[in-house]
Amino acid sequence: MRLYRDRAVVLRQHKLGEADRIVTLLTRDHGLVRAVAKGVRRTRSKFGARLEPFAHIDVQLHPGRNLDIVTQVQAIDAFASDIVSDYGRYTSACAVLETAERLAGEERAPMPALHRLTVGALRAVADGSRPRELVLDAYLLRAMGIAGWAPALTECARCATPGPHRAFHVAAGGSVCVHCRPSGSVTPPQAVLDLMSALHDGDWPAAEASTPSHRSQASGLVAAHLQWHLERQLRTLPLVERVYRVDHAVADHRISLLRQDVHRGDEPGDQLAAGS
């Protein structure tokens, strides 16, 4: 089979043998691809640094039986340095990558919309011009929409009666009317559901006008909805920093650990998840 070329986001990588790595890529035209990058752990590797997590690359691959082989790499966007320099950006970007991999589904199933959304989210997190917690929640809502899991926010998830409806139930699919409301539903302020709608629709002026309390509640609903559909918790979401007052000494220590992960090519957040 011939070589093929595609644009990709590097989701993660891990060691293989003495000098190689296996990289997991979300490509534009070929979906999820796992490939071997030979010799990238050697100091003279010509493209090792271009295969760090968070990188947006143009990559050429040779198809293999189980794993493809990376033959050429050109950097398109190098988001890693801006992301890793800040703990909050890093954890948010890690959640983006993990979500992308989970939602990509089977290998080689094209997901161009998810690829495009993931690149945009990483660019926004790295740029830092918008609150990272809002960028993450907007990404999660839109990614769930691509997967067909978007929560109902403006109509009843069960009977489609137009809203607004105050009750929200994850298993029911989002907002529910008084007639369909299951036991265990929560009743967040209407502003919380309005914020979720704004994030899903890209209404940034409305989203950025929200209060910290409403952002926190919206984040909780978004995370719960995603994890219910995934049927397991994301490793990275508990690490996401959504608090504005941070102990800078702790944050600096965490950043140093995260930089070590990226430098060594470990999966982002391994040391934090291990409690180091």
From Swiss-Prot:
Matching SUPFAM superfamilies, A to Z?
ArfGap/RecO-like zinc finger (SSF57863), Nucleic acid-binding proteins (SSF50249)
Q: Which InterPro entries match?
A: ARFGAP/RecO (IPR037278), DNA_rep/recomb_RecO_N (IPR022572), NA-bd_OB-fold (IPR012340), RecO (IPR003717), RecO_C (IPR042242)
- Reply yes or no: does the keyword Nucleotide-binding apply: no
Source organism? Mycobacterium sp. (strain KMS)
Q: Which family does it belong to?
A: Belongs to the RecO family.
Task: Name any Gene Ontology BP term.
Answer: DNA recombination
Q: Does the keyword Hydrolase apply?
A: no
Encoding gene, per UniProt annotation: recO
Its annotated function is as follows:
Involved in DNA repair and RecF pathway recombination.
One family name in Pfam for this protein: RecO_C
Alphabetic keyword roster: DNA damage, DNA recombination, DNA repair
GO CC, sorted alphabetically, is: bacterial nucleoid
Lineage top rank: taxon: Bacteria
Name of the molecule in the record: DNA repair protein RecO
